[in-house]
Amino acid sequence: MSVLLETSLGDIVIDLHTELAPRSCTNFLKLCSKHYYKLNAFFRVEKDFLAQTGDPSNTGKGGASIWSQLPSTSQDSSTSTYFTPESSDGQLKHLKKGTVSFACFRKHVQGADEDGEGGSCELLAGSQFFVTLKDELDYLDGRHAPFGMVVEGHEPGGTLDKINHAFTDDQKRPLRDIRIRHVVVLEDPFADPDGFCAPSRSPSPTPCQVRALRLADDEDVHSDVDPASKEEMRRNADTNAAALTLEMVGDLPFAEIRPPENILFVCKLNPVTRSDDLELIFSRFGKILSCEVIKDKKTGDSLQYAFIEFDKKDDAERAYFKMQNVLVDDRRIWVDFSQSVSRLHGDWVKKRNAGSDAPRAHYQSGADEQSVDSYRPNAGGYQKRGDDRRHDRRDQPTARGDTSSWHSRQDSERSYRESNDDTRDRSNKRSRRHHDDVPQQSRSRSERHDSHRDHERHHLSRHVRPSDEGESKCRYEAHSHTRHDEHTRRHDSSSTAARRDEDRRSERSRHDRDRDRDRDRDRDREREHRRRTEDRRRHDDRQRSRDGSRR
């Protein structure tokens, strides 16, 4: 008791309530078997309300039941275009998104007023039906006849959501046609009415349907645009989408962020060129707020590129045009505008945290913790407070699209360095404690030995004869030297064992990190292989279903 509707926006599978609404389900199933709904358009789509179709004329005024289309010789034929659907007595309601109902109208019986009071009224329906696009539409109960529920296509981002977000005109009709391309009856438990004959093939579009065509779902709206403009539009759309994604994940303060226009990037410098020299050369173009040649943190060697921040945008532009390919310290330098927004992001994070510390990576790169700069664009350009300190910009991404991958790479490298630093600090502390404890123990032992030696010397001076005093003194000194040599050997052996243990722990931690890295790499490869296999399988299934529908 299921029907598959293949629409231009995706597939919809409907389960029918054959026990609660047998007459409505019979009408719907036989119309589907007759391909009555093929190429019907959703002529009425109201956001978060309903999507209506089932009228071959696509006007909302046509459509007929299956019994009115039977031959006149049939026992089940009816002269009326409409039929009376069942009343479910409150068992079927419009409570969930995806409820399928026949669009009904009231027929007033004699003695009833316009509101249906003072007499009796009955609901009549033809072929038009609608699908609800929201939960809890209980005010439709008693006015229309539910007979099914969407079981596939109602998930978030599915076909119903695509229909719900379609652009419509003033008459609530989608600007781009949403049509039922094909109908497949998966299961039909009802017998065919007398005189019913299903067509042998899918019928061709009627002239009425052709005249009602608007903008086809596969028609290119930019067909009159030249390829260059179309490519530019595509690139702009991709750039805006990527920037919006970075803003949502927190990598950018806002999607429209732009690099500062008063900062120049200078590269191909001589390793001997210093920040003061570069500032002196560029200062003839205007006031310089900061000039820094980026250096390696460990060795202190120049990385041969620098950032120069001018007070005004015009000064930076003049320096850009005048200093391009100029010889500085026997090197032809290259000047360009800075494309980095990392400092802007760090300042934004600091403001968002309402005075709390900015991310550690931001301060490690040289940013000032006491000042907050404003780089949002306004009529006068980017503004900045007087701060001459610039942070380290090496390995910064030059393209906006690489910001997310660069941040993830920097985070992994930073965590690796911090783990090594913590291990090194712990080992240094242990070695310092060991070296500090050993002299203290030696001093305490030497003090005890000195007191014991003085006591023995005093005892010998009192009880030993003068002739034996020299021999006893030599014997005591030899014993003291022997104990001192033994203590020295013990100290050396303990220090060697401590160093050996520390080297063994460092080697074990390095092997653990290598093993974890290899395991993560194998897991990523396996996940990528599974994803590709699943994509290939879905593509093959889609191709087979498309070939089957063509046949």
Curated annotation (Swiss-Prot):
Domain PPIase cyclophilin-type: residue ranges: 1-185
Any Gene Ontology CC annotation: nucleus
Pfam families: Pro_isomerase, RRM_1
Coiled coil: none
Protein name stated in the entry: Peptidyl-prolyl cis-trans isomerase-like 4
Chain intervals with Polar residues compositional bias: 66-88
InterPro entries: CRIP, Cyclophilin-like_dom_sf, Cyclophilin-type_PPIase_dom, Nucleotide-bd_a/b_plait_sf, RBD_domain_sf, RRM_dom
Domain RRM: 262-340
Basic and acidic residues composition-biased segments: 384-397, 408-454, 465-551
Family classification: Belongs to the cyclophilin-type PPIase family. PPIL4 subfamily.
Record has Isomerase as a keyword: yes
Main function: PPIases accelerate the folding of proteins. It catalyzes the cis-trans isomerization of proline imidic peptide bonds in oligopeptides.
Biased composition (Basic residues): 455-464
Keywords (A to Z) from UniProt: Isomerase, Nucleus, RNA-binding, Rotamase
Species this protein is from: Mycosarcoma maydis (Corn smut fungus)
Cell compartments where the protein resides: Nucleus
PROSITE patterns the record matches: CSA_PPIASE_2, RRM
